[in-house]
């Protein structure tokens, strides 16, 4: 998955899709939807393994337990499945802190002489898809 994504659905659409409700304090504090430009460090809806009927807002990016600086979370937004359970950055989260992260699109970039052009990619028959977090 790329570094930029989108989630243009309303809170109600997400609640219906996942049969869950937003954690009320998260919505009072911040109302992020819809968003055509989800980027690392942005607040984004997440459904955790521990609370599958509550949608929380968490900052996008992974901060390993051993990190001395939270800025490492800006860079840890992608993981390859091969070896994820062995890499120190992802191992503990992979085994103990699983979640799903909803999106409705992501961007791939084409380089041109004038600069980069974003292309938004969506699934043809699915309004909302999730990635593993």
Model-derived segments and spans:
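Short linear sequence motif anchored by a di-proline
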Residues: 1-133
């Amino acid at each position: 998955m790329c570094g930029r994504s989108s989630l243009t659905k309303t809170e109600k659409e997400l609640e219906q899709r996942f049969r869950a409700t937003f954690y009320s304090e998260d919505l009072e504090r911040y109302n992020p939807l819809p968003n055509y430009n989800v980027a690392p460090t942005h607040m984004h809806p997440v459904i955790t393994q521990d609370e599958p009927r509550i949608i929380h807002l968490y900052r996008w990016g992974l901060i390993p337990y051993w990190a001395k600086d939270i800025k490492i979370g800006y860079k840890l937004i992608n993981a390859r499945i091969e070896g994820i359970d062995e890499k120190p950055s992802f191992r503990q989260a992979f085994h103990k802190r699983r979640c799903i992260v909803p999106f409705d699109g992501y961007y791939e970039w084409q380089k041109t002489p004038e600069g980069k052009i974003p292309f938004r990619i969506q699934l043809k028959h699915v309004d909302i898809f999730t990635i593993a977090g």
